[in-house]
């Protein structure tokens, strides 16, 4: 599945579709209106030995080399690895409490989201758990196996991008908002987060 639309490289979207495809290609940020350059990517996707990473890299280079629209974030996810990512995340989030997100890498602008870097969010949300170093190393290993390709420009429009793990995430607040109530229906929330403190 190639999600040629904005903000779809989130752990929540990927996890929801984990049993629907082998590879998932998407963007943590917005994608500019041109979208995927089909003339450059289709040769990679239609040959006998499909080269998904080559197609993703061609997309990144198309935007990165552009004079007036050199903004892009893109990832390729091996969906067979997401259950391991989920297991490692659940261990880290076993004592989860909502966190202050002001210093997290943000991938969204304006009224969209907000969406944050997945690995950084998990780190900040779990850094005080017992045996954190061992647990986070296991999480990092699982995530690195799942993200077979990622690339990002230093900025996306007015957003400075200091880090990008390849996936974004929603910050759970247990605040009872409409967005949170919808989030509670997703597989990722139900498989990962403690439920006792929901409003």
Language model: regions and residue ranges:
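Terminal, contiguous helix-loop blocks that mediate binding/assembly
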Residues: 1-199
């Amino acid at each position: 599945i190639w999600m040629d639309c904005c903000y779809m490289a989130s752990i929540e979207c990927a996890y929801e579709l984990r049993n629907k495809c082998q590879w998932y290609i998407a963007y943590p940020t917005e994608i500019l209106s041109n979208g995927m350059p089909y003339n450059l990517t289709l040769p990679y996707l239609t040959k006998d030995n499909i080269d998904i990473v080559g197609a993703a890299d061609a997309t990144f280079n198309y935007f990165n080399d552009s004079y007036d629209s050199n903004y892009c974030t893109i990832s390729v996810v091996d969906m067979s690895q997401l259950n391991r990512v989920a297991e490692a995340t659940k261990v880290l989030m076993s004592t989860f409490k909502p966190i202050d997100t002001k210093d997290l890498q943000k991938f969204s602008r304006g009224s969209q989201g907000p969406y944050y870097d997945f690995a950084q969010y998990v780190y900040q949300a779990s850094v005080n758990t017992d045996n954190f170093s061992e647990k986070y190393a296991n999480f990092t290993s699982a995530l690195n196996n799942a993200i077979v390709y990622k690339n990002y420009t230093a900025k996306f429009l007015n957003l400075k991008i200091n880090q990008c793990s390849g996936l974004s995430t929603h910050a759970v607040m247990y605040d009872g908002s409409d967005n949170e109530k919808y989030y509670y229906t997703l597989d990722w929330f139900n498989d990962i987060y403690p439920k006792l403190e929901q409003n």
